[in-house]
Amino acid sequence: MQVLLVRHALPLRSEHGQGSDPNLSDEGIAQTARLPEALARFPITRVLSSPQRRAIQTAEPVAVARKLPVEIDDRFAEYDRDLAAYIPVEQIRAENPKEWARLVQGHLPSAVDEDAFRARVLAAVADLVGAVDPEDTVAVFSHGGVINLLLHEILGTARMLSFQVDYASVTRLLYSRSGQAMVASVNTTEHVWDLLPRNQRLLDDDAARKG
């Protein structure tokens, strides 16, 4: 079985008290528009998503293109789903240095139960692997923490958060009939390279130099 782990596109920010479930930003919507073509070569048989809006909205263009429903599995939600706000990870460094230090060290935010997060994500994947045909390709629209956890479990990295997982990126996992997992690719972003925040800054700087 092949699993395509797609991180959600760029969301809006939510402030304290607004919850951690924002919609996609305009930039994020532009990123999602490129996913149907980027995934066109894969014979996707099911589309699964986290219950969070940013993941569902990222999944919808692919589901529409394939004429498949978006199946929701709560267990693919991000570790932040019960937090009071959503701050894009690239903004945490300046606004909350203590939590940023935890992330750099490979830990989840202090308010998150890492063991519970790990247990629910691994259970979701185990159930998925057990429920589909070995020849199936399933697209799972989820989050950077979920994708990092799965890579950590498969590759045995020292830290849970070890990988750069960009918005609308694709990470490809292969599962044998016995459930053995292999990593085929990580953080494929060619389809949205020019739409990622850090790359847009590089492009802007380059344009300024040429101007």
Regions found by a protein language model. Give the residues of each.
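Short beta-strand scaffold positions
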Residues: 49-50, 119, 141-142
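Generic beta-sheet signal
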Residues: 3, 136-142
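Active-site signature of alpha/beta-hydrolase-fold catalytic machinery across serine-
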Residues: 61, 149, 153
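Acidic, low-complexity terminal tails and accessory targeting/binding regions
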Residues: 71-72, 78-90, 130, 134-136, ...
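Generic structural signal for well-ordered alpha-helical scaffold segments
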Residues: 33-40, 118, 122-130, 151
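Active-site-proximal alpha-helix that buttresses catalytic centers in soluble enzyme cores
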Residues: 2-72
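Short active-site segment of divalent metal-dependent hydrolases/proteases
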Residues: 11, 146-147
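Phosphate-handling substructures
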Residues: 65-123, 211
